[in-house]
């Protein structure tokens, strides 16, 4: 329903109809992309629809409604969160940690129900924040946190920014559903790196990151953090003719919600245990963090018989994975200087096996963290991987101290340049090097610039970068492109003529890298690879991005106000302008002129396993350059699955759905044959790809 009263009569009927059509179309494509993982239009076509809707809503602000897709980008600053009462209490779950206990749970269930076997639904337990979502006539009206289970906080404005949460359902239902809001692993890692660079304390785990984000008063900040969702529960399922949890999951997907694809219907508790064992080993394949399996009695009539306690249902239980912690000892603490000057203490550890890798170092984040946790050199400590990826010290073990342990004190000067250290503001946690010319800052910036994700200058490793900066040959990132054989020869032992020639050749090749790789290499705060690609696709040149206004940037899907502000501030800096000019004079490609071929146009691909000639990112880029659509999961709409070494569950699903599979070698032959049919030279395509990548 549009707002606007008397003014509505002045708006042309065709405009109202176009706005409604655009909203329906955009929500449909959001559903295809974020829920089904199966888009049917290009990003460019989607952006065009969104820009048109934004344009019409600006011309006719009376047409803006709370459920418009344009409201997802955030921009409001909230005064606080009001308390709301849940229609049905949001209970917690009892936990179990081993197979014996889950078998006991099954025995209790069967005894109460007087059944010989009970069917269960096993669902991955997402490490996120519980959420209740309400809809009236298919339109989103409320998002509330669990709170104490009886009352929660109204976080509707922040929930709107989450792309996988539909603002309109695919049916005009009045319904309440529940699920989990989570932060993907890559986003968690990016956010913590960014926070450490900015001198802020990192989040301990993805759940804390999601919870902290959902309670932000600035909705634009929430939008920039790319939260995601899985929905798994229907309140009053009998109102919709649902008799089992498994039916409810299919129903949720049909009406527009993102449902975890790995849930499984189990005939008995033994199948539940097999599922738990499988995902205990496979959990690192996922792009979100899971800490166990939720086991639910499938039939709703059985659930009613079993009932619940005041705290938890008797028909469900959390079957947790073993905690991944290890005990080790701190041998020393070193200080790293970040790109923005933040001094980060790093614990040097006795090597210890943890979650499949040997851990020798762990970030201590900042000196306030060290003080709060009472961590000392020589302490025995517990280490775990935050979000399954980042080693961090959870706690020290004071009981094992001998008296020889040493306190960890903040440095009085920068350990690299000897310059003054301090805080940018009294309430800042981080201590920084205040010297604007500190070589450590430049070294970190250069490592980002030449990394594989950016300009990929392999010959410029850490040691050579250190020598280039220490010798004064490189004073900013653009100076890389002005190096001469004579400059490199001055760097001392190990830099022979062949090495020099190789480095200079790689630097020359780096000038032709795609625009998004250059943008990534600049190290703009909040701009990673994904955002860099959006900018390159939209603007086509670095200079156009540099000239773009805040208003233009914030309206681009995938950018939003916070990232837009960061980009504008970065390019407003006179030093940035100087660097761009130097890059231009050196012959670095500042424009996107990527040639695309329609060799695989109209075909949908998925990929599983490890490939020989491509990383996962590269094969996706390659397929998209050839006109294919790439999806993360296999469905009946997938044309081909490319299978590498050690394939995952996609391979089994492809076989079950009779989706065609091909090895990497078969795929390349397939491309060669399709190229010939369309009149393209395969060798030219591959040469162009190598230059572009």
From Swiss-Prot:
Name of the protein in question: DNA ligase
Reported function: DNA ligase that catalyzes the formation of phosphodiester linkages between 5'-phosphoryl and 3'-hydroxyl groups in double-stranded DNA using NAD as a coenzyme and as the energy source for the reaction. It is essential for DNA replication and repair of damaged DNA.
Reaction catalyzed: NAD(+) + (deoxyribonucleotide)n-3'-hydroxyl + 5'-phospho-(deoxyribonucleotide)m = (deoxyribonucleotide)n+m + AMP + beta-nicotinamide D-nucleotide
Protein keywords: DNA damage, DNA repair, DNA replication, Ligase, Magnesium, Manganese, Metal-binding, NAD, Zinc
Cofactor (UniProt): Mg(2+); Mn(2+)
Species, as recorded: Thermotoga neapolitana (strain ATCC 49049 / DSM 4359 / NBRC 107923 / NS-E)
InterPro entries reported for this sequence: BRCT_dom, BRCT_dom_sf, DisA/LigA_HHH, DNA_ligase, DNA_ligase_AS, DNA_ligase_CS, DNAligase_adenylation, DNAligase_N
Enzyme Commission designation: 6.5.1.2
Pfam family, one: HHH_2
UniProt binding sites for Zn(2+): 414, 417, 433, 438
GO CC, one annotated term: cytosol
Catalytic residues (positions): 125
Residues annotated as binding NAD(+): 43-47, 92-93, 123, 146, 180, 296, 320
Family per similarity comment: Belongs to the NAD-dependent DNA ligase family. LigA subfamily.
SUPFAM superfamilies: BRCT domain, DNA ligase/mRNA capping enzyme, catalytic domain, Nucleic acid-binding proteins, RuvA domain 2-like
GO biological process: DNA repair; DNA replication
Segments forming domain BRCT: 595-684
HAMAP family per UniProt: DNA_ligase_A (MF_01588)
GO molecular function, one term: metal ion binding
């Amino acid at each position: 329903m549009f707002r606007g009263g008397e003014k509505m009569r002045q708006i042309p009927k065709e405009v109202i109809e176009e706005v409604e059509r655009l909203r329906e179309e955009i929500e449909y494509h959001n559903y295809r992309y974020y829920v089904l993982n199966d888009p049917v239009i290009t990003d460019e076509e989607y952006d065009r629809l969104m820009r048109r809707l934004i344009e019409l809503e600006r011309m006719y602000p009376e047409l803006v409604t709370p459920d418009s897709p344009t409201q997802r980008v955030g921009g409001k600053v909230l005064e606080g969160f009001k308390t709301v009462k849940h229609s049905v209490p949001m209970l917690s779950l009892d936990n179990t940690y081993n197979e014996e206990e889950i078998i006991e749970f099954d025995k209790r269930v069967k005894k109460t129900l007087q059944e010989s076997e009970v069917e269960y639904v096993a669902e991955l337990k997402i490490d996120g924040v519980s959420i209740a979502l309400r809809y009236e006539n298919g339109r989103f009206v409320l998002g509330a946190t669990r709170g104490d289970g009886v009352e929660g906080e109204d976080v509707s404005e922040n929930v709107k920014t989450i792309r996988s949460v539909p603002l309109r359902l695919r049916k005009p239902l009045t319904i309440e559903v529940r699920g989990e809001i989570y932060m993907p692993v890559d986003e968690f890692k990016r956010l913590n790196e960014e926070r450490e660079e900015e001198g802020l304390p990192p989040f301990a785990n993805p759940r804390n990151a999601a919870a902290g984000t959902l309670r932000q008063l600035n909705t634009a900040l929430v939008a920039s953090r790319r939260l995601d969702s899985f929905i798994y529960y229907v309140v009053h399922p009998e109102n919709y003719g649902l008799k089992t949890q498994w039916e409810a999951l299919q129903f949720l997907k049909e009406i527009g919600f993102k449902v975890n694809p790995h849930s499984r219907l189990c005939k008995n508790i033994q199948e539940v245990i097999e599922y738990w064992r499988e995902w205990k080993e496979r959990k690192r394949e996922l792009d979100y963090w899971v800490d166990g399996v939720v086991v639910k009695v499938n039939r709703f009539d059985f659930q009613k018989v079993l009932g619940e306690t005041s705290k938890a249902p008797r028909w469900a239980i959390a079957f947790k994975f073993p905690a991944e912690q290890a005990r080790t000892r701190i041998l020393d603490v070193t200080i790293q200087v970040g790109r923005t000057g933040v001094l980060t203490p790093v614990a040097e550890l006795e090597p210890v096996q943890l979650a499949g890798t040997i851990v020798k170092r762990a970030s201590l984040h900042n000196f306030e963290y060290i003080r709060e946790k009472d961590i000392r050199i020589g302490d025995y400590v517990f280490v775990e991987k935050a979000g399954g990826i980042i080693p961090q010290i959870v706690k020290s073990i004071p009981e094992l101290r001998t008296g020889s342990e040493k306190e960890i004190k903040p440095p009085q000067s920068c350990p690299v340049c000897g310059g003054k250290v301090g805080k940018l503001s009294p309430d800042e946690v981080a201590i920084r090097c205040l010297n604007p010319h500190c070589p450590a800052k430049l070294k970190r910036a250069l490592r980002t610039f030449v990394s594989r994700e950016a300009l990929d200058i392999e010959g410029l490793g850490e040691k050579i970068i250190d020598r280039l900066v220490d010798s004064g040959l490189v004073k900013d990132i653009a100076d890389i492109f002005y190096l001469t054989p004579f400059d490199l020869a001055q760097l001392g032992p190990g830099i022979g003529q062949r090495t020099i020639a190789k480095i200079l050749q790689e630097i020359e090749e780096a000038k032709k890298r795609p625009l998004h790789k250059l943008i990534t290499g600049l190290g703009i705060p909040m701009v990673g690879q994904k955002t860099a690609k959006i900018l390159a696709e939209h603007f086509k040149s670095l200079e156009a991005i540099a000239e773009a206004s805040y208003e233009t940037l914030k309206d681009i899907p995938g950018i939003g106000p916070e990232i837009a502000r960061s980009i504008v501030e970065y390019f407003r800096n006179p030093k940035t302008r100087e660097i761009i000019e130097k890059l231009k004079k050196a012959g670095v490609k500042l424009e996107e002129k990527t040639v695309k071929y329609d060799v695989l146009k109209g075909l949908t691909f998925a990929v599983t396993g490890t490939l020989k000639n491509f990383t996962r990112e590269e094969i996706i880029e390659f397929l998209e350059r050839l006109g294919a659509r790439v999806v993360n999961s296999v469905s009946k709409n997938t044309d081909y699955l490319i299978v590498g070494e050690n394939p995952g569950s996609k391979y089994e699903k492809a076989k079950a759905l009779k989706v065609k599979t091909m090895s990497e070698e078969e795929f390349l032959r397939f491309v060669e044959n399709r190229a010939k049919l369309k009149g393209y030279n395969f060798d030219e395509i591959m040469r162009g790809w190598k230059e572009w990548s």
